[in-house]
UniProtKB/Swiss-Prot annotation:
GO terms for molecular function: ATP binding; magnesium ion binding; methionine adenosyltransferase activity. Pfam families: S-AdoMet_synt_C, S-AdoMet_synt_M, S-AdoMet_synt_N. Keywords: ATP-binding, Cytoplasm, Magnesium, Metal-binding, Nucleotide-binding, One-carbon metabolism, Potassium, Transferase. This is S-adenosylmethionine synthase. Homotetramer; dimer of dimers. It comes from Haemophilus influenzae (strain ATCC 51907 / DSM 11121 / KW20 / Rd). Catalyzes the formation of S-adenosylmethionine (AdoMet) from methionine and ATP. The overall synthetic reaction is composed of two sequential steps, AdoMet formation and the subsequent tripolyphosphate hydrolysis which occurs prior to release of AdoMet from the enzyme.
Amino acid sequence: MSSYLFTSESVSEGHPDKIADQISDAVLDEILKQDPKARVACETYVKTGMALVGGEITTSAWVDIENLTRKVICDIGYEHSEMGFDGHSCAVLNAIGKQSADINQGVDRENPLDQGAGDQGIMFGYATNETDVLMPAAITYAHRLMEKQSEVRKSGKLAWLRPDAKSQVTLKYEDNKIVGVDAVVLSTQHSEEVSQKDLHEGVMEEIIKPVLPSEWLSKETKFFINPTGRFVIGGPMGDCGLTGRKIIVDTYGGAARHGGGAFSGKEPSKVDRSAAYAARYVAKNIVAAGLADRCEIQLSYAIGVAEPTSIMVETFGTGKVANELLVSLVREFFDLRPYGLIKMLDLIQPIYRETAAYGHFGREQFPWEKVDRAEDLRIAAGLK
């Protein structure tokens, strides 16, 4: 019997890097509302008292970058100086330029289906049947802990909670099946006056226990709640934040490979984002079809070229049919050219700010989470 531990982490919407991601995606959404043909690569940097928004954007839209940035920061919960960061009073700097004409000529085409990839690169998508959302369990529950922290904070149930927080979940497996939670780490920013006793009790009763399955918890489960003790200084006052620095949190928590490209602030001509979404869509439909228990897809592209330069399917010994057959089915049922996958997943819409906290995958409101091709795949593969 094989036994092992696997761990994934998540961070809250108030983590500095996630503030940056949400600002970048809020800018993207506002532009897409006005100009569906915009080219956007928006990067944000936050530190004590300031937010710098930059990047390359070519658009006919007009967006009030300063007011939008302030709104995002305040929506997260940084709206007075005792937090160490205040969306009402922080400096907002704008350093946005235009996308290179050299890139434009490789992407834009007279026939939209010939649209080339915005860059070269590799992208991965993954799915597993160990949760109902076909995501790895460790990252799923790490995200849910952070969502619960935000819910409890914003409802006022634990008034001393502050926006910055991190979670980490270690699961124990035997013969590739989850048998329990080995360890939970939850660190949350808090106000000055709360005692460590009240903090530990509140986090355990209001955040951890309502989220983690009780049958996975035991006397052996280890809980690390604010293990350093005090966590008053947090958010951008404690650490600077930058768009695109939480790429494993954004995806599969380390349970699958990552091509290296970040998502936030990029419109769908950037295959770093759109093809990673398409790869998740493909992998999820393969698992939903019962063709594999686990599935990882790799795609690759060349700048200015429409067709993917490669498609790989890996099922880790869980496939019900050969991987070669799965590759041919992927080519038959999914249009993975940049324009094709944009249309297939309806990606030109202002949905991206919501992706920028608590993970891009495993959340049913997003179009790449549909399993509408599962039955077609199953029939084509010859499974009853």
